[in-house]
Amino acid sequence: MKLLRYIFIALALPVCTEAGAQTLADFIATGLENNYNLKIARNEEAISANNATYANAGYLPTVNATAGYSGTVDTGSGQLGHGVQGGVNAEWTVFDGFKIQATYAKLQELKRQGATRTRLDIEDYVATLTAEYYNLIQQKIRMRNLNNAVKLSKERLRIVLERYSIGSASRLDLQQAQVDFNADSAKSLKQHELMATSRIRLYELMAVKDMQTPLVLNDSAIDVDATLTHDSLLEATMRLNAGLLDKRHNIRLAELDYKATMSRDYPYIKLNAGYNYQHTIEGNGRGGVDFGVKVGYNIFDGKRTSQKRNAQLNIENADLARMQLEQSLRSDLADLWQAYKNNLRLLSLERENLVTAQENHYIAHERYMLGSLSGIEMREAQQSLLDAEERILEAQYNTKLCEISLRQISGDIMKYME
């Protein structure tokens, strides 16, 4: 009972973090500021915002200024006549069947869609960085487990050497202990490489140019949120998923395109005004103001009917794409939820297995020190402990990946910024 109580206390104790360590939120904030893909996405969003103006929609008049010089030669008298001309003309479309209003509304919708797509890129980025952050934690924990295995193998090799020197252990025992120590050392070296790869990947995601910059994580364990519920996730997904919001923007854009097409069924009204001036070499000058109103109606252009039908089909297709994505999201959520719940159950089971493996290893070590357990049996107990540690680590990380994906699909991924 004392041993079990000690094991449970050891599992429950928090691990102290280093001074100056950075949290996940710190890493995300750095990445959001530096990542090149996100900078491009923000620039594209800014372009959409810049385009959403009254001028681009056609609300404002067009003004043109002209100037010229002309000359003539009388072939009979040889006299040269020349002069200069200049003028300013303006034209303003007052009404064109609501096409201007539809165009402006479309530009505003494109602006909102640009913001949604930037959010989509940000959420993808946060999910990727969060997964890599916890992957590095996973690699660090695995490194710690392998280092412990190396220490145990080294201690066993020391004991066998002492026993071999006094004749109480065979050369076979010594060779096997050496092989096991070398194998554990090789795994530890390989794990250093995997840990460095994960660290470099984090540097890349955060656009950190100096790969030697110290990288100290505030977290040393993979904490899993077991409080998620399916109904709340489904409701949030249908309401907040960025990809689904983008499809709804597409429906609105298709509706505005249809409205612009329908504008051809209405007359148009245009106002124009101008001032023109002409001056000749003889000193004569004249100028004047002209203005007018033009009303017109497009009786037939040969394409109006098909364009209306195509615009209606585009609305239908946009709505079908939305429904298709909704169905896909429901399916993805169901798969992720099943994996999430299964991994939670697996995690609970592996916690029990780890306690058993730790107790078994403790007993085996005591018996080995007393000489009542062979080196092979001691190695089996050590390997069982390492396997149990690896299984619970994989269960923790896989559960965390499911949690990250569930938060992303439901539009709640930015919670990791808190």
Predicted regions and their residues:
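A short glycine-centered flexible hinge/capping loop motif at secondary-structure junctions
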Residues: 164-168, 368-372, 409
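Sec/SRP-type N-terminal targeting helices
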Residues: 39-43, 56-60, 94-122, 147, ...
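Small/polar, glycine/serine/threonine/aspartate-rich low-complexity segments that form flexible
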Residues: 66-96, 102-103, 216-227, 259, ...
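Periplasmic alpha-helical coiled-coil/stalk elements that build and connect Gram-negative outer-membrane
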Residues: 26, 124-236, 336-339, 343, ...
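Bacterial Sec-pathway N-terminal export signals of envelope proteins
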Residues: 19-64, 209-252, 326, 337, ...
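Bacterial N-terminal signal peptides
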Residues: 7-15
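Acidic, low-complexity, intrinsically disordered peripheral segments
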Residues: 26, 391-418
